[in-house]
């Protein structure tokens, strides 16, 4: 990995992973500059960098300059507004992967341009393997921390300019390195929340964004698989596919949300078997490992972060849309989430789930 004094911009989040990534690069002979991207500053984007007082390590040899770049305006438009609109459209968004593409890498590459750096780096648990013709995105070595699912939107060109120094390490190894490097965040706990969703309660974020929305949608119908009204709900945006709790319905068998109907403010529920899907339709595709398939092709598909994957056939059905046919049914396929395709450890592409098909 060593390239003596090659200049790298490292995305600094304040956590242990990005700090260790920076220190690894320093130890390997890179010239490192940190970039902290501000996204919740309640102001518009800034086109200039500001010196940040952040100090990552207590050891002088692992100290480096850190700048901040304000992308709050872009974050509000490209991430928060998308997040809200998806819920209002009956979908379940994944803002972190959109943020990676449109905010983090946009900001890092902008910082690299302003500071005349050749590469960018982050603390993501994934790997990049660059050959003569292309760069491949691979799973991280630590299967419990692998974040390749969140990076499927990145282009081959973006991958070619990126280093992921902790991708071949386990979390325990990163903690151990952090202590050796004197990283101040060595013992910092990981946040499991979306950064703009307090207490991980997306419903309150949706409600506060649209005054009067909750009152307007309260009382919508809950129907069963035969169309019979069996209850009422608090508003379709506040439910997700596979949800069981909070329905307020008495039933001899557990009931789960299996469809949202924004036009009628209606949700449909049924037994667990109704969550099984053999197919899905995906759009907004990005292919990094292969060219867009013109005929059916095989892969393994993950439909959520912790999904272990399922063998499938990918079939082009129309421009920019593909049908994914699973070898075995998948549970709780959720429109708005990503389906990411793998061959062994390599991410070959992905897309956004448009429709789940139960037949």
Swiss-Prot record:
It holds the Pfam family tRNA_Me_trans_C. Disulfide bonds join 99-195. It comes from the Bacteria. The keyword Protein biosynthesis does not apply. It is an enzyme of class 2 (transferase). GO terms for molecular function: ATP binding; tRNA binding; tRNA-uridine 2-sulfurtransferase activity. It is found in: Cytoplasm. The active site is at residues 99, 195. ATP binds at residues 11-18, 37, 123. Signal peptide: none annotated. GO terms for biological process: tRNA wobble position uridine thiolation. Its EC number is 2.8.1.13. The keyword Transit peptide does not apply. One of its GO terms (cellular component) is cytoplasm. CDD domains: MnmA_TRMU-like. It catalyses: S-sulfanyl-L-cysteinyl-[protein] + uridine(34) in tRNA + AH2 + ATP = 2-thiouridine(34) in tRNA + L-cysteinyl-[protein] + A + AMP + diphosphate + H(+). Catalyzes the 2-thiolation of uridine at the wobble position (U34) of tRNA, leading to the formation of s(2)U34. This is tRNA-specific 2-thiouridylase MnmA. It comes from Chlorobium phaeobacteroides (strain BS1). The lineage of its organism: Bacteria, Pseudomonadati, Chlorobiota, Chlorobiia, Chlorobiales. The gene is mnmA.
